[in-house]
Amino acid sequence: MLTLTRIRTVSYEVRSTFLFISVLEFAVGFLTNAFVFLVNFWDVVKRQALSNSDCVLLCLSISRLFLHGLLFLSAIQLTHFQKLSEPLNHSYQAIIMLWMIANQANLWLAACLSLLYCSKLIRFSHTFLICLASWVSRKISQMLLGIILCSCICTVLCVWCFFSRPHFTVTTVLFMNNNTRLNWQIKDLNLFYSFLFCYLWSVPPFLLFLVSSGMLTVSLGRHMRTMKVYTRNSRDPSLEAHIKALKSLVSFFCFFVISSCAAFISVPLLILWRDKIGVMVCVGIMAACPSGHAAILISGNAKLRRAVMTILLWAQSSLKVRADHKADSRTLC
């Protein structure tokens, strides 16, 4: 027998807790990604040449700032403006569409970063692969422009796929024990189709990311076997670079899979079952993932680590000066 899920209301305590967690996640995510952006952008202001990896990190931080902003707007929408009788109002649809596009650009940039790591760290023996690695290193700016172009194309196609369908309501009456009325809205299905369509466009960069990460893993294995045979020195710059790059890529893979699963689960939770608490949990998971990867990127990048140490030393010296000033003022009194 077919059973329907009743629409559950969300208490004020749950909404307040979710909003508080969302504010914390937004603050942490905004600060970490804004830090990555400002450190690299400051070099641009000083007219210093950015490395290829710094250019990718600059673009990646911008896309994640958009992601965090959209997820925070989604949290505000869920807690204050969204009604369970009509969960997909126009503003929430726009937030979801923009999030899908920003997430798509984020994946393309991660694939570009993975290719860059491969071109720098892997020692190729085949002539074609050597030429390809050299081409990737030289054409990174064009690749970033291509990512922006692909994101714009995906934006147009997703918007066209969503808004080209008719938006009307089909009502089906099911006679059950309580004579419940089930409303199926075609616009809900349109959003789900657009969601699937955008995820299909994510397959090429995801495969590119997996292939390049796999090649880097194989290269690390070969390098470790070579070290065991020819040297006993445990400290090797190339090995450390391989490990840092793989740590960044593996963490992105884990965070991206978790975030994508949460996003995919949130759609039927919202459209079919009207489970706002489940959607809140999914949005919280989606907001935590970019912050975690940004923290790993900061810990694995020498320039960003130096900037963090500079800020910490400045804060420590400022606190010490204030403490000494207060002690001197008390002595004078």
From Swiss-Prot:
The keyword Kinase does not apply. GO terms for cellular component: membrane; plasma membrane. Residues 39-55, 116-142, 212-251, 298-333 are cytoplasmic. It is found in: Membrane. SUPFAM superfamilies: Family A G protein-coupled receptor-like. The chain crosses the membrane at residues 18-38, 56-76, 95-115, 143-163, 191-211, 252-272, 277-297. GO terms for molecular function: bitter taste receptor activity; G protein-coupled receptor activity. Expressed in subsets of taste receptor cells of the tongue and exclusively in gustducin-positive cells. Expressed in testis. Most taste cells may be activated by a limited number of bitter compounds; individual taste cells can discriminate among bitter stimuli. This is Taste receptor type 2 member 38. It comes from Homo sapiens (Human). The lineage of its organism: Eukaryota, Metazoa, Chordata, Craniata, Vertebrata. The gene is TAS2R38.
